[in-house]
Amino acid sequence: MDIVGGQNLRQMWDDLAGVYGDKTALIFESCEGIVRQFSYASLNEEINRTANLFYSLGIRKGDRVALHLDNCPEFIFCWFGLAKIGAIMVPINARLLGEESAWILQNSQVSLLVTSVQFYPMYREIHQDNSTPLNHICLIGEQLPADDGVSHFSQLQARQSATLCYTPALSTDDTAEILFTSGTTSRPKGVVITHYNLRFAGYYSAWQIALRDDDVYMTVMPAFHIDCQCTAAMPAFSAGSTFVLLEKYSARAFWDQVRRYQATVTECIPMMIRTLMVQPAAPTDRQHHLREVMFYLNLSAQEKDAFTERFGVRLLTSYGMTETIVGIIGDRPGDKRRWPSIGRVGFSYEAEIRDDQNRPLPAGEIGEICIKGIPGKTIFKEYYMQPEATAGALEPEGWLHTGDSGYQDEDGYFYFVDRRCNMIKRGGENVSCVELENIISAHPKIQDIVVVGIKDAIRDEAIKAFIVLNEGETLSEAEFFSFCENNMAKFKVPSFMEIRTDLPRNCSGKIIKKNLK
C-alpha cells in the first residue's frame, strides 16, 4: 500500500505552505524562556533560505552535511533545507565528544558541519587536525570567531532568497538522512533513511495518535533522535498541527509548558515520568488539554497507574527503533489497552516471534521480535557502507531482526521481555557495552573490563564497570571516573565501578554477565 504517492519532502513543504499558510507550524522555547514562532508559510521560507545557503556553500544533491545542535529552529531549517536540494543530513548526538563525533564525520565523509558556538572548540580541533574531510563549519550563535573555514549561519541565511534556486530532480527513494545509532559493535551504524521513509513516518504516526490539524504536539525529545523526527515532527507537520519544540527537558517547567501551549499530545520516556512524579503535587496537576502521552519502554504497572491517576492522562505505548523508523507495534487511541502489552502491529507491517533457528513461534512462547516491512519505505533502507551488517539484520524478503525478545498472546498483542544483547538503556539513550569496554580498556592500569546495566529508579538502567587491574596497580574512583569523563559522552560514563581480581567466564572465554548483576 503506497500512502506517500511519490511526494518527496520538497513537495511536502511547498504543499503545506500553500494549504496552511499563516497557521502556526512551529513554536520553539529556549531554556531561557525565549520563544520563536513560525507559520507554515514563513517556516517554508526559512527552509528555502537555508537550502539556498547550503547551495551557496557548494552543497549539491547527494552531499552529506552534519548537524551537531541542541534543539533549535535551525535544526528544522537545515533538516528540510538539505532535503529540498537532495542533500543528506547527518545528525550527531549533541552529547558526543570529539573522538566520537570525528568518527562519524569520517565515516560519512562530511565536508560541511552546522553547529553552535558551544560546540565549536571541539570542532576547531577536529578541523585543524585534518583527520576528517571536514573543511567548513557554519556556526549558529553570537560572538563568532574570525577563523578560516568558518561562516555565520544567521548572516548567510538572511542574505538568501526565500525562493528555492536549486531544484534537482528528486525521488522518494533518495536518501534524506544518515542517522548513526548505537549498536552491539564498538562503533555506531549509519541508518539510511529515505524521503519515502520520512513521508511515511508522518502519515503513519499521525494515524497512530489520530492527529488532526487542531492538535498541538509538544516534545522535549532531542531533534537528532528518530523519535523526535518521526513520531513527533513529521506527524505534526504532515497533519497540519502545531509542533512545539522545547530546547531541554525540565521536570519543574514541564506541566506549565503543557498548559501554556495547550498541548494535546506529548511523548515521555520513563525517566521523565519518574522525575515528574517526584515534583510536589499541585492543584493544577490535571488542568491541561493532553489527550495522549506517547510512551516508550520501560515502566512498572504501579508507576504507570500512579502517573495516569495523578495527572489524568493515558499512556499510548509505542515500540520501535531507528531501523523501523516509527513505532511499528503500539496502542491505538480507540482500542482497549492491555498493559503491559506494547500493543499490536500497525498497518503496512507484519510481526512475528521467532526462535533461534528463525522459525515462527506460537502464542505465549518467548523469542526474537521480527518485523516485516519494505526497505527504504516502511523500514530503513540499509546501514551506510556496511553491507554485512545490513545482511545480518535484514532478510531479502524484508524481515528485520530486532534482537529484542518478546512474545505475543492469542489476540495478537505483543509483550516486550528484554533488550538487545549488550545494550544498556539509560534515560532514553542506547549505550553499547562493547564501545565503553573498548574505551576503558585503553587505560594503562586496566587489564580487563566489562560493563553491565543495573536497575535505576529514574533512568531505567545505570552503568556499572567491573575491572581487573594490571598486577601491582592501584586505581582510585576519582581517577577512573575522570578518565571516562574525558573520553566519552557524559551519558555513557559509568555510575559505579568495582575492582575485582578476575571476571567470571564460560568455557569459551566469554564473560558471564548475569553473574555480575
Curated annotation (Swiss-Prot):
Record-level GO BP terms: carnitine metabolic process; fatty acid metabolic process
Superkingdom per UniProt: Bacteria
Pathway: Amine and polyamine metabolism; carnitine metabolism
Single GO MF annotation: medium-chain fatty acid-CoA ligase activity
Pfam families per UniProt: AMP-binding, AMP-binding_C
Top-tier EC class: ligase
Keywords: Ligase
EC numbers on record: 6.2.1.48
Record's catalysed reaction(s): 4-(trimethylamino)butanoate + ATP + CoA = 4-(trimethylamino)butanoyl-CoA + AMP + diphosphate; crotonobetaine + ATP + CoA = crotonobetainyl-CoA + AMP + diphosphate; (R)-carnitine + ATP + CoA = (R)-carnitinyl-CoA + AMP + diphosphate
NCBIfam families referenced in this protein's UniProt entry, alphabetically: PRK08008.1
Role of this protein: Catalyzes the transfer of CoA to carnitine, generating the initial carnitinyl-CoA needed for the CaiB reaction cycle. Also has activity toward crotonobetaine and gamma-butyrobetaine.
PANTHER family: ACYL-COA SYNTHETASE (PTHR43201), MEDIUM-CHAIN ACYL-COA LIGASE ACSF2, MITOCHONDRIAL (PTHR43201:SF5)
Protein name per Swiss-Prot or TrEMBL: Crotonobetaine/carnitine--CoA ligase
Organism in which the protein naturally occurs: Salmonella paratyphi C (strain RKS4594)
